[in-house]
Amino acid sequence: MSDRVDVGNLRVARVLYDFITNEALPGTGVDADAFWAGVDKVVTDLAPRNRELLERRDDLQTQVDRWHRQRAIEPLDGAAYQDFLTEIGYLVPEPEDFTITTANVDDEITTTAGPQLVVPILNARFALNAANARWGSLYDALYGTDVIPEADGAEKASADTGGYNKVRGDKVIAYAREVLDGAAPLASGSWKDAVGLKIDDGQLLVELGDEFSTGLQNPDQFVGYTGKLGKPQWSVLLINHGLHIEVLIDPDSPIGSTDKAGIKDVVLESAITTIMDFEDSVAAVDAEDKVLGYRNWLGLNKGDLSEEVSKGGKTFTRVLNEDRVFTTPDGKGELTLPGRSLLFVRNVGHLMTNDAIVDAAGNEMPEGIQDALFTSLIAIHGLRSGKKNGPLKNSRTGSIYIVKPKMHGPEEVAFTAELFGRVEEVLGLPHATLKVGIMDEERRTTVNLKAAIKAASDRVVFINTGFLDRTGDEIHTSMEAGPMCRKAVMKSQPWILAYEDHNVDTGLGAGLAGKAQIGKGMWAMPDLMADMVAQKIAQPRAGATTAWVPSPTAATLHALHYHQVDVKAVDQELAGKHRAKLESLLTIPLAESRHDWTAEDIREEIDNNCQSILGYVVRWIDQGVGCSKVPDIHDVALMEDRATLRISSQLLANWLRHDVITEDEVVEGLKRMAPVVDRQNAGDKEYRPMAPDFDSNIAFQAAKELILEGKDQPNGYTEPILHRRRREYKAAAAK
């Protein structure tokens, strides 16, 4: 990129400089010249420290690799291994007990347990849908998914034709009544028997027939209503475990007319928080890509992001939802609730650089430092409302919420805290305005989690287990120890069970309850919602105040779990427990015996992973899609991002390193699976098949490189190869 602006010691891409100066800075109160001088100072000062931290990662990995190679024929001695990790500084002393001091945090983080969406910031439509997913129709979520089986005449009708299957609709209504019975039980009888609702002297009454009415078992669960009493269209607002439920009443509507109580929908407070992602779910490899993400982030914070959407043959403009206003039960006051999810922004980690900013010698500067500066500047608009900042606020407490991924240990968390402090100085923000969400997704952070939290104890607003990346790091860290177990077995290994408990226990021990989120990972099968409803309740039962979901519909369905589980009570019960032992966390997931694998087992593992890798990489390289719903080898749609890619590529790289498989077998597996992926993408007009010209297909070559060179990638990360290959593709396409 030749069109650059000199900023002190730096050279900034013109597209970025113009966007920040002309679009992002106005309305923030930050002087443009002072800001760019601050950028120059922060980047110049902190880039060398960033590089030192990456060198420390490499040095530790080299020492761990050497230790395992020297003991290749010996059984692993757990005590000696732990001593070694302590000696080299991989394990650090655990700090004395402490309590985090994070202040000025929104209720969505401190007190309300509920689902958390993660969405790629480069896609404006996805970002708008996610921000608006604070409230979701339970009827739509049930009708449109497999939670209601398509049996006994309950098949879905086509939304495009306006069809509606009343048999299925009746099952949806019955399911929703069961939800109400569990979340807001009546003093007598069941919501299933309701034939009407009314408000009398500030109390909600539910008519059950024969002129009999009953109230709620807990009358305080009725907190508001909309509409005018006595009119046909109105709604009732309930609350349970801090989450709201709106019962919409309209006996003249198509659905309400089939309901004996006139209820047309039950709307659940769903995605309480949403992470707008600049990291694993996006493919941003240059200044133009970054500016696209920054511009969408600006639109979200100013409240003016919009997108033309076509649905059911109609086109409309999607915008951010307004707040929701209810009348209090006594009819005298108002209750205003947020209409949108509280937004976090996930910056990239410490590893990657980006050509948006280079130094005088042309060296790219750390992308994580750039993200911290620019996403924080933009988020100032979300702290204010007015003519220059837009009508909507994000935080009501004056905080900016940044998720920082892929940090290795306390010293990297401390560096992030230092970076955030420097950014606050540049922007003129009070200390600790920038809050941090710590992803517990790297092994060195897991085993030193208490110290990592303490390193940002006045900023931390969440810790979250990211078991996908964490598995990738588990494999790479112990690459030389021996062949790892198969991917499907990994979730039942001792380390991962201890990891999930350890995260909750450490968070509670550091006083996160009531101050910060304790989160758990993603449901990766977006079409299998019945399975999610059956299984994901385990996360709040384990003490998680939030957990990741792949779609607004999934957020609405996962919200059911927080009505069923009182997470505050669970956390009170778990407080003070230490269920996970360090020995378990350090248990390497080696295969019990490679000799138990048949040739068919090995081929199946090769094919499964090659198909997963190709299915994700081809869209990343060719289309710049960072998060895909990729069919697996059995055509089950799975959410894939760089974390799942890291696992698949690292597992095959590990097996290659230990001669479980050969390079030829890997290449043959990729060539077998490429036509499968081509077939699965046949309906995509923009898709370019990989077969049969494998040698000239950049995506195919990237997938091969990720496996064959996997053991030499920094911590097993896929970004360096993906970014280089995507740039190669973009350059070729531009010719």
UniProtKB/Swiss-Prot annotation:
Pathway: Carbohydrate metabolism; glyoxylate cycle; (S)-malate from isocitrate: step 2/2. It is found in: Cytoplasm. Its main location: cytoplasm. Disulfide bonds: none annotated. Mg(2+) binds at E441, D469. Its cofactor is Mg(2+). The keyword Transcription does not apply. One of its GO terms (cellular component) is cytosol. Keywords: Cytoplasm, Glyoxylate bypass, Magnesium, Metal-binding, Oxidation, Transferase, Tricarboxylic acid cycle. GO terms for biological process: glyoxylate catabolic process; glyoxylate cycle; tricarboxylic acid cycle. Transmembrane segments: none annotated. One of its GO terms (molecular function) is magnesium ion binding. Involved in the glycolate utilization. Catalyzes the condensation and subsequent hydrolysis of acetyl-coenzyme A (acetyl-CoA) and glyoxylate to form malate and CoA. HAMAP family: Malate_synth_G. This is Malate synthase G.
